[in-house]
A protein has these predicted regions:
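ABC ATPase nucleotide-binding domains
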Residues: 44-123, 354-420
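Helix-to-loop junction immediately C-terminal to a conserved catalytic motif
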Residues: 176
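Conserved ABC transporter NBD signature motif
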Residues: 184-192, 201-202
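Conserved ABC ATPase "signature" region
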Residues: 235-253
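Conserved ABC ATPase signature
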Residues: 257-261
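ABC ATPase C-loop
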Residues: 274-275
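Catalytic Walker B motif of ABC-type/P-loop ATPase nucleotide-binding domains
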Residues: 282-285
Length: 420
């Protein structure tokens, strides 16, 4: 049998695919063994495709440090472990590496720690014993959320993660008032959603759809932002439109029809519409879904800008690289319940938890565990910095010693071909 997949996630390709075809401008650019194709970094980046995290790391550390036996960069965690630390320790011994910038794992019971940290502060969002579901033809009633209790505070960057059907999008809709819980209460900024119309809640809470094209009703992005502001009763609409276009770097899209733009452009413009009224709470459903490398960077940049204007941001996402690098609180949902509520390091360092929630551990976290880092490393930049600093430290001779100590890192001189 032959299985053909259309896939942007290069880690999946590295683990499961034998061959790789790059399609560009309506034609086949090349066909290569997957390990070779994932090493054609210039070609991948030209098409805005993320190479695997371990490949990005190998490309960024000092030349020759992280190549495998045939001279290419690693594409899987197994290959990266061998390439980086093949000579680091005797068989069966794991090296312990202090990691500057890494995050110490914490308890999965984030709520108790957060209660102590927040003291007597009032939560921005409160859910108490929330149950919700939908009627189905086969099962009668599908319980999506069951007895959910959560408190979210100002300053939280919250990521809801879990498999399809775990309740992420349902939870976001409950927070907007677009749906009412079958059981329990949902309160946003002290107001129960059952006691308010969705348009009243929209004064302070903005929901940015998973399908961004649903947010465009006018024939230009400029008019769409103005339309939303007028409907919210905003003052000085024209100057506010120009302000948001400039602040979020949307000027190039301002006079284009949002319905005819690419998905990445639509996502950026929809964020402009949602952030125009300076909301207190922003809810985003799959903000980087179906985006290429460049669009993902642009959307992530807008999210970071929003932090200075918005009290609480909640995203539902399958993009665990985004979650690891952006969120400070990760809520893992599974079959209507909270499996974990903790900082990213604690969540992504727990292989058993991830398996129970049907989530894949980011390559960089798995690699930091394999290499014996004291704490999980959450981003490729942090891993590159840690490896580079460790190498420089190990390579510095002690006083009175004429030779540098063994770094524990293979000093291979193999380099990649010009195709890179």
């Amino acid at each position: 049998k032959t299985v053909i997949v259309i896939e942007h996630h290069s880690e999946f390709i590295a683990e499961y695919c034998d061959e790789m075809v790059l399609v560009s401008d309506g034609g086949v650019a090349w066909k290569e063994p997957a390990q070779v194709g994932l090493n054609r970094l210039n070609d991948l980046r030209a098409e805005n495709i993320h190479p695997p995290q371990v490949t990005q790391i190998a490309d960024a550390v000092p030349a020759g440090m992280a190549t495998v036996s045939d001279g290419r960069y690693p594409v899987t965690v197994d290959e990266a472990e061998t390439a980086l630390w093949a000579e680091s320790a005797p068989p069966g011994e794991q090296r312990s590496v202090p990691t500057e910038g890494a995050t110490e794992p914490e308890s999965h019971s984030h709520s108790r720690e957060k209660d102590a940290e927040n003291g007597d502060r009032e939560p921005v969002i409160t859910l108490r014993n929330v149950g919700h579901g939908y009627p189905t033809l086969r099962e009668g009633y599908n319980q999506v959320l069951d007895g959910l209790n959560l408190d979210l505070y100002a300053g939280d960057r919250v990521a809801l993660v879990g498999a399809n059907g775990s309740g992420k999008s349902t939870l976001l809709r409950l927070l907007t008032g677009l749906e009412s819980p079958d059981e329990g209460t949902v309160s946003v900024l002290g107001q129960e959603t059952n006691d308010a119309l969705p348009e009243e809640l929209a004064d302070d809470t903005v929901y940015i759809h998973q399908n961004p094209e649903e947010m465009f009703v006018e024939d230009t992005v400029r008019k769409d932002i103005g339309y939303y502001l007028k409907n919210r009763g905003a003052a000085d609409v024209e100057s506010r439109v120009e302000e948001i276009l400039t602040y979020l770097d949307l000027e190039a899209l301002a006079d284009r029809d949002g319905r005819l733009m690419s998905v990445g452009q639509q996502r950026r413009a929809s964020l402009g519409i949602g952030l125009a009224t300076d909301p207190t709470v922003v809810l985003l459903d799959e903000p980087t879904g179906s985006l290429d490398l460049q669009s993902r960077r642009e959307v992530t940049g807008i999210l970071r800008k929003a932090e200075s204007h918005v009290e609480t941001v909640v995203i539902a996402s399958h993009d665990l690289q985004l979650v690891a690098g952006w969120a400070d609180r990760v809520i893992v949902l599974n079959e209507g319940d909270v499996l974990a509520d903790a900082p990213p390091a604690a969540v992504f360092d727990d292989a058993e938890l991830l398996a129970a929630a049907d989530l894949r551990q980011p390559q960089v976290v798995a690699l930091s565990d394999r290499l014996g880092f004291d704490t999980p490393v959450l981003t490729t930049d942090a891993m590159v910095e840690a490896i580079t600093n460790k190498t420089a430290s190990d390579a510095t001779p002690a006083v009175g010693d004429g030779a540098a100590p063994d770094t524990g890192i293979p000093n291979t001189t193999q380099t990649l071909g010009e195709e890179q």
